[in-house]
Amino acid sequence: MTEKTTDNRNTFTTQATSRAEIRELLEGIFVAELLVPSDTIWLVSPWITDIDILDNRCGQFSSLVPTWGLRRIRLSEIFAYIMDQSIVHIVARPDPHNDSFLQKMRDLSKASDSPDNLRVVIRDTLHLKGLLGQDYYLSGSMNLTYNGVEVNHEGVSLDRSPESIAEARIHFQENYESDQ
């Protein structure tokens, strides 16, 4: 009998060890995006802050983007790099909490070689959370904020099945691309 492999990984944050899993999961997703960028990336989160994604203080990620230096790398910096090759969709709520991050993303986009690669959509009733790339869909209860990653009890699921990825992409396109 052959063992069935799964395309899905669930993580629940209630203690320090599972919070480390969430950080490592996000780190892995974004390192993969830096190496082989998706054509389109979707970040759908009611609340977003410019959280640290990569800890490059020891230089382990310096070969990816040498100009970053030995420090923590924030979400906006990763998206700014990815926007040169990919379209980045960000969907959020109209909340002052998001303003700083969204303005930073708009400024980085304007200063880039591909200013049209950032698409921001604001939805009053947004509660869905997800991060979607070419070959993954991270979904669950977690907002991409410090509290979402480090404080709150959350549950996330990383799904790599083509069916789930396609379903999420269709949903995001139908509901959040029309504002463009």
Task: List each model region and its residues.
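PLD/PLD-like phosphodiesterase catalytic module centered on the HKD motif
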Residues: 1-180
